């Protein structure tokens, strides 16, 4: 039995007691965690609610404290409850049987495998334009999305992870312009170039630099100048070729460029433990006529109209009220421009309808990448797949989370409202914008990465990146810098490790540092990334939490197997041996015992925190909890002689608690995407 299940058992007992004793049906029973363990493990303010309901039903006025006294005896009958006290005007404070619960928590619970039978939820994240290498802003998106996926799965949800590939957009077109008109390369020459590049300067890095050159090319070499309309025509020519697709040589060149960038980006994300189920390509949405189908559905539903006058004459728009009335938000409601081209909002509505299984069309599919652990990444395609292809069913989710930065809040609102207008029965709540703020760099981080700063920039709290200007930090460079810093720390702490083990450990520490730093701030917070702060082994950091888990493993490596086995046997005796139960209860009593018990109770809140994170869509809460658990275990480790304790019962309790913390802390870190190395 988990702590959550025990709490539910107590709630149900109160419902039964309220029904049988007072003839009142409670819809829900709220519970609170007392601020200190000596006040109880769980408090129910239900007596006050019952007093109101009884008066409404019978007109009789009852004292909440008297109601609490009648409920008290019912709760005391539960095996896992040691005692119940009534506090104040009628609070019911429940004290658990610490010894029994320790024995219960020491036995690992089997994971719930019912997710396959549950309605599917979908999370789209990362979704980087495939025109160059990923940067630090993309990493925040990917880490947030990946962690939220892990949270949903831990909460028992069935999840499909999608990565939208905008391979027909302006950004890809600009890089194609660069290859064709600046580099003077055809497809074969680009392939030869790609093959010649080394591991330190990969294809996505080359495209990064080329993209910056194209931006200057459009402005005749002057960054602040207006764009040359004649040169911008080259972009439009490429965009038309991408729309045509098929055997168009420019479209084929663009497909190679986009696909290679996707492969490089996937390699970057793999370094952070981030994977996907499906790559949904915009070219396939275009060529399989998803938009035409969505346009028809929108016309039939009467949610789109063609403007005949004013500045939007000739455009198809959704006539929703703007919440700000700004020109920018008015333009977001345009679905088809007067020249017949579809806006991003229009394409997003078509894609969202497909994700929710309401479009009436589907993609064709192919395997894009197979991972060594059996995970397969699929990609959409326009061509019909081979007959008998065994693949998962994609799309058809009941809820879709789109991880997109907060600047897209209003367009995402339009998408949700547009989909709900076409299919009213699913409502706007089926489309959830998982928004977040930007990530920048601290001035110190910029200097570590070799970015030149002016005196004015050095005085700023953070430096904002700009991909088009070439002012940015590639994700791989960021990871490499973190690995170098982590390696120096690992070499200092563990000089006896082999070079391979040092590098492997440094990688895990670097990933922990980066992921935790990006997760510990709430989504609506602008982050200024700082290497020194992220890599610190002290304070609220990934390495600190990691080190606490490493320490639990170190304890069990040092303990003799027979000592651990004896501890397990003794703890198992609690359930059927009253004398042993009393001895364990004695260890967990008093001020010192209560501190140990508080740590155990904190560890058992993980399930509740996971559910809270799922409901609030805020991974930062799990990061904060993980740090709290790591910090509490560190205090426990320093306060108790786990390895040298002579008393058998006390030693067994300390070992059992350490084992519980190891399980819960490792699980929490895993959901954050952080592995626990052997040594640090």
Which ranges hold each PLM region?
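Short, charged, solvent-exposed linker or helix-capping segments at domain edges/interfaces
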Residues: 103-108
